[in-house]
Amino acid sequence: MQTTPEPVPANSAGPAGSAGSTDGAGPAAATTGVPASPDAPLSRPGLIFAVSAYTLWGVLPLYFLLLAPTGPFELVAARVIFSLVFCVLLLTVTRGWAPFLLLARNPRVSFTLGLAGVLIFVNWQTYIYGVLNGQVVETALGYFINPIVTVFLGVFFLREKLRIVQWVSVGISIAAVLVLAIGAHGVPWIALILAFSFGLYGYIKKRVGGTVDAVSGLTLETAWLTPLAIVQLIVVGATAGLTIGQVSVFHTVLLVGTGVITAVPLLFFAAASRRLPLIYMGFIQFFAPVIQFLVGVFILHEAMPVERWIGFILVWIALVVLTTDTVISARGSLRRRNKAASGAPQQL
């Protein structure tokens, strides 16, 4: 996206072991219901929904750049508030208030989504700061390494044991970050904050499982964040000054539209997750950072010195290693399940 680039959301592990996104750029913001089984046939509508979601997350930098001279703090606050407004409208139109209120009255779910909201707020703030400060390529890096960071977090929080190949992938990624840090004479903080905030976001969202639909999840998260967003707007208004309503009608419409461009890819992602096997979702998740990378290099002409190319190539190698290992493991698990099913006694 996942968030999504831009987090996004869903929290099912794809081939890279990542949490599906709701949007930092992605994806990022809700669970998606029951996913298709690994051996389910490929759904053309599901494929269209998935590609549409990740493509929209991929081109988000261009949308945000159209909002100049709005700064990152005003933009993130506006995004939170207008996302909440749009979600409220969706709940009203789809008659989704009953299940939403049921979730909101559940203290565990509500608090968990509030904590997830804080993480996605950090993710959005970092992402938009990077985009508006000429660091689109580094934001793409954050979402490239997110699947590997998610695997890394699983070791510490879930006490998961990694296979040797997975450790190799993590090691290559660490080497990539070191190369990028040496080349840039500084740690790529934007990429690391994006990757870890979205990885932690996915971990927390797993705690509520598939009980929260996309719209209700985003509504609860943005509702928790709205007081913070209002305070942020007050501070911006008292210092730099607000731009909403001060530039042009087109600019104001685009700013209000941040709520729509946050929710629509998330809904596409939710629809895709219900129709496509997770292994396909895992591959398609790389559409967003690939598009962001291409936007940064070929449209915005961000610098790509040799050290940066080496760092990115190492990250891509790590992803190929991790994805290949996960696909092989998934196929092995599927064969074992099929063998167990075929050997089960038949009822008469």
Named regions from a protein language model:
Residues 141-145, 211-224, 263-298:
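Helix-helix packing/entry segments at the starts of transmembrane helices
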Residues 67, 75, 79, 114, ...:
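Hydrophobic/aromatic residues within transmembrane alpha-helices
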Residues 2-52, 85-113, 164, 212-213, ...:
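Membrane-interface interhelical linkers
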Residues 55-59, 63, 114-131, 193-204, ...:
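Hydrophobic alpha-helical transmembrane segments of multi-pass membrane transport proteins
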Residues 3-4, 182, 187, 286-348:
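C-terminal-most transmembrane helix of multi-pass membrane proteins
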Residues 56-84, 138, 200-225:
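Juxtamembrane helix-loop-helix junctions in multi-pass membrane proteins
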Residues 62-72, 99-101, 131-135, 177-178, ...:
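Membrane-interface helix termini and inter-helical loops of multi-pass transporters
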Residues 129, 146-166, 290-309:
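C-terminal transmembrane-helix exit sites in multi-pass transporters
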